Amino acid sequence: MCGIVGAVAQRDVAEILVEGLRRLEYRGYDSAGVAVVDAEHNYTRIRRLGKVKELADAVETAHVVGGTGIAHTRWATHGEPSEVNAHPHVSGDITLVHNGIIENHESLRTLLQERGYIFESQTDTEVIAHLVEWELRSSGSLLEAVQKTATQLEGAYGTVVMDRREPERLVVARSGSPIVIGCGVGENFLASDQLALLNVTRRFMYLEEGDVAEITRREIRVFDARGEQVERAITESNAEHDAGDKGQYRHFMQKEVFEQPKALINTMEGRITNDSVVTESIGVNAVEILNKVEHVQIIACGTSYNAGMTARYWFESLAGVSCDVEIASEFRYRKFVTRPNSLLITLSQSGETADTLAALRLAKERGYMGAMTVCNVAGSSLVRESDFAFMTRAGTEIGVASTKAFTTQLAALLMLVTALGKQQNRISKEKEKEIVEALHALPAQIEQALSFDKEIEALAPDFADKHHTLFLGRGEFYPIAVEASLKLKEISYIHAEAYAAGELKHGPLALIDAEMPVVVVAPTNDLLEKLKSNVEEVRARGGLLYVFADEQAGFEADESMKIITMPHVSDITAPIYYTIPMQLLSYHVALIKGTDVDQPRNLAKAVTVE
């Protein structure tokens, strides 16, 4: 949820560190800081509450020089947003940044206070700094001190430590919070996300759980949780160097909404032919595993959970395989029963979602036949720890409110469902061809849906002055309504809820009045007539109706109901298609409200703490 950048080089690194933080702004933060030391042990630390630009201005004014440094953007967990709580934190000659949550920080704080340490901040991070300083007194090296400290920490952390007396060395420890090392020539870097380093290197080494690494200009030494030196593979990244550029768009979210046709094409490339899904493209051993699957368990959070809820309808109606979907933070704390031949599927844009990772690790101990992830970031923890991965190829997603990651997850899941049904002879060749043709048509249809931008923008003022909004859908369009309500909440700060339309009589009707906009997703399918009855229930109680309706659905607009007529598309891919106008509506409402669309308050892009 926070951002870390570090560098050991012969050149001055302050500008590299600040630029790295700029590239991580999308993750969400409330303060930022940097610390740099030069070869003569001259040391500078600068922290600022607010945006990275304020830190950058301060660094430029101070003429910060030095070849070794660390930088951080903080998203407050322990302690309010303030300059004193901002990272880096200091203890003696030790300077440190940290992502994660130290669960035993209170007992460690008490212990350290008894040893005479004085705390300046409210953070759990300062505990780590003092611990390292204490252990260094009896250790032969900074590496050893960090290793000893790591054994005392409970919780999640990715931490980078610098000793101003050793100005050409950084030590990093990882447990539950991602750290990637960027490998250069005569210089090395590290970050919590490779995006921070794409302007300085394309070669990356991903640390595993429990790793501690020592980094100098010319050497990277990695030690596992047992303290044994190990080799970690270096991979070449093909991620977009200019992912942090909005181009012609006002916001990253807007850019990413309009990138969805291309993202879908990329996700489907090489995975579908003219009339079939290429099962082997889903992952290593996919054919063998899918032949045996009797049940699917999906685990996810947030938008990814909504994608899983949509896919459940496909798994059961198309592939004939039972499917359960659970929120990761709930799944891991209940006593669940593992069904025979059950395939575990995790969904995550970042591949680093803390609760999803923890649920995966728990589930792997409980007898699932295999663990698959649908993910957007190659080399992420979920990808490395799963048996096989189906990458979504959406490209870097900067906006906190997920858009193209959601629709590409849905496309990937639909291909998976089709492959599963085909392998088990539950989907005929004719049905497979119908699904594939619908997928082929989808990018052009999404382009068409994006052309409704101006029409949807005209609706936004009707929502911007309201305090609540209700979204309705039936069947597989209920999760789409849930996702729509989440988007409106995230970026416009309007309270929004979604209900399966058949539940109106069981409570939500009590909320309906002239101040409650009700958005309805209305494709032409078997549930249309029942949905029309639900719409009439809202109309009869004076609700403000906004119906996104298939052109064949037969709705007629009047003073109480606005109709946005959508071209007819395949029932199979319609949930993906109807997502687009929901995204556009939320975006335009947020513009009127004047909120921070790309970095909504209190939210972070990658939730790497529990």
UniProtKB/Swiss-Prot annotation:
Major localization listed first in the record, in broad terms: cytoplasm
Positions of the Glutamine amidotransferase type-2 domain: 2-218
Active-site residues per Swiss-Prot or TrEMBL entry: C2 (nucleophile), K605 (for fru-6p isomerization activity)
Subcellular location: Cytoplasm
Gene3D superfamilies named among the record's database cross-references: Glucose-6-phosphate isomerase like protein, domain 1, Glutamine Phosphoribosylpyrophosphate, subunit 1, domain 1
Keywords: Aminotransferase, Cytoplasm, Glutamine amidotransferase, Repeat, Transferase
Listed GO CC annotations: cytosol
Record SUPFAM superfamilies: N-terminal nucleophile aminohydrolases (Ntn hydrolases), SIS domain
Catalytic activity: D-fructose 6-phosphate + L-glutamine = D-glucosamine 6-phosphate + L-glutamate
Enzyme class, first EC level, given as a word: transferase
Signal peptide: none
GO terms for MF: carbohydrate derivative binding; glutamine-fructose-6-phosphate transaminase (isomerizing) activity
InterPro entries: GATase_2_dom (IPR017932), GFAT (IPR005855), GFAT_N (IPR047084), GlmS/AgaS_SIS (IPR035466), GlmS/FrlB_SIS (IPR035490), Ntn_hydrolases_N (IPR029055), SIS_dom (IPR001347), SIS_dom_sf (IPR046348)
Job description of the protein: Catalyzes the first step in hexosamine metabolism, converting fructose-6P into glucosamine-6P using glutamine as a nitrogen source.
Protein name: Glutamine--fructose-6-phosphate aminotransferase [isomerizing]
